[in-house]
């Protein structure tokens, strides 16, 4: 994985979107994009190459949109170090739709992109279990499905499969429940964050990696795991699931 220091220009460019969204939003963006290996992995592996219409389920304050737009800007710059030399070109988004159940996160996202009318992004407040999904070439679900019960998890995945065209892509991050101590640590951290943000207990419905892959196959996808630990102690896995 690319050293975090090499990503400083990209992280700064993405975090700059949040200068109008408040100090917390901008600081959170900078820390999250610097230390969470999922964002770098998406670009380093080129998993969204050629995907122009993106649907982000459980988008939070829109970090993925900021990351991808900043990536395109950095890639087109001539300045040395603006883009990691070994990375493939980033995707060029024609449209991005993020759906988020937390109204405060949606408000931050909308404020962040309000000064960039050229960015083809929209943020919808609602529940991914209920809202209609717009047309997309790729759907991204990062650290979201384990907040839903098992029946809802499958229902969302089947709806995603129906919404995607042939050769469509689903990109998911999950925690491998068979990962031993790393999983226990990650789950404890997740529960703490949820309690701090939501002020209530939320049950987590996790699965082992093999069970996630089996479920995806049952829902019409062919999935493979991508390396993503990035030096962290957790057992998170990025799943690249193509329409079978």
List the model feature ranges, each with a label:
Residues 2-45, 61-132, 151, 171-244:
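Class I (Rossmann-like) S-adenosyl-L-methionine-dependent methyltransferase catalytic domain
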Residues 47-49, 165:
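Short conserved AdoMet
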Residues 52-60:
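Conserved class I S-adenosyl-L-methionine
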Residues 136-137:
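Local beta-strand N-terminus motif with an aromatic residue
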Residues 140:
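A conserved beta-strand element that flanks and buttresses the S-adenosyl-L-methionine
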Residues 143-144:
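Short catalytic micro-motifs in class I SAM-dependent methyltransferases
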Residues 154-166:
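A short glycine-rich, Lys/Arg-flanked "PGG" loop and its adjoining helix->strand segment in the class I
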């Amino acid at each position: 994985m690319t050293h975090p220091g090499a990503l400083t220009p990209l992280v700064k460019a993405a975090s700059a979107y949040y200068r109008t969204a408040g100090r917390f939003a901008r600081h959170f963006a900078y820390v999250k994009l610097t230390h969470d290996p999922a964002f770098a992995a998406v670009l380093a592996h080129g998993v969204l190459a050629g995907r122009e219409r993106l649907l982000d389920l459980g988008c939070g304050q829109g970090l993925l949109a900021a990351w991808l737009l900043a990536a395109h800007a950095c890639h087109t710059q001539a300045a040395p170090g603006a883009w990691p030399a070994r990375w493939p070109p980033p995707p060029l988004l024609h449209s991005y739709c993020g759906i988020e159940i937390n109204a405060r996160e949606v408000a931050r996202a909308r404020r962040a992109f309000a000064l960039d009318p050229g960015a083809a992004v929209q943020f919808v407040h609602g529940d991914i279990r209920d809202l209609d999904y717009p047309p997309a070439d790729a759907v991204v679900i990062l650290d979201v499905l384990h907040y839903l019960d098992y029946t809802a998890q499958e229902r969302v995945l089947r709806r995603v499969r129906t919404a995607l065209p042939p050769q469509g892509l689903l990109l998911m991050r999950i925690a491998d429940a068979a990962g031993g101590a790393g999983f226990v640590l990650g789950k404890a951290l997740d529960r703490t964050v949820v309690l701090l943000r939501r002020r209530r207990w939320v049950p987590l419905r996790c699965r082992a990696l093999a069970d996630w892959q089996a479920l995806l196959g049952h829902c019409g996808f062919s999935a493979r795991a991508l390396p993503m630990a990035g030096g962290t102690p957790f057992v998170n896995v990025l799943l690249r699931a193509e329409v079978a």
